[in-house]
C-alpha cells in the first residue's frame, strides 16, 4: 500500500468521512487524523469554500466539527461521533461543546 493510500484510508476511519470528504480534508492539508487535533472546523469550512470557489453544503461543516472532536478525544462518545450531532442546535450544542465562535454568534 502506498503512503498516500494509507493516509487516505486513515482519514476514512473517522466516522462520517468517506472518499470525497477525505479528499476535501487533504485539500486543507490534513493528511492524518492527528492533523485535525485543535483545528477550527468553521475555519476549515470557510477555507474549503474559498478553495472551491463556491458554496459548500453545510453538512460538510458538521462533519468537520465531528471529525475534530473525534480526533482530539481519547474516548469519543459514540453519539457525538455522528456528524448530525454537530448540526446547529444538535446534541453537541446542547452539551455546550460547540466551538466558541459558533456559540457567540448564536447568543
Where are these regions (language model features)?
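C-terminal extensions
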Residues: 1-15, 19-107
Amino acid at each position: 500500500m502506498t503512503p498516500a493510500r494509507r493516509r487516505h484510508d486513515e482519514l476514512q476511519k473517522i466516522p462520517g468521512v468517506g472518499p470525497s470528504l477525505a479528499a476535501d480534508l487533504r485539500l486543507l492539508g490534513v493528511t492524518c487524523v492527528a492533523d485535525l487535533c485543535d483545528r477550527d472546523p468553521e475555519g476549515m469550512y470557510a477555507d474549503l469554500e474559498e478553495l472551491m470557489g463556491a458554496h459548500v453544503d453545510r453538512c460538510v461543516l458538521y462533519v468537520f466539527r465531528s471529525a475534530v472532536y473525534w480526533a482530539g478525544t481519547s474516548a469519543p462518545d459514540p453519539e457525538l461521533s455522528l456528524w448530525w450531532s454537530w448540526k446547529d442546535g444538535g446534541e453537541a450544542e446542547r452539551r455546550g461543546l460547540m466551538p466558541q465562535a459558533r456559540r457567540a454568534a448564536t447568543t
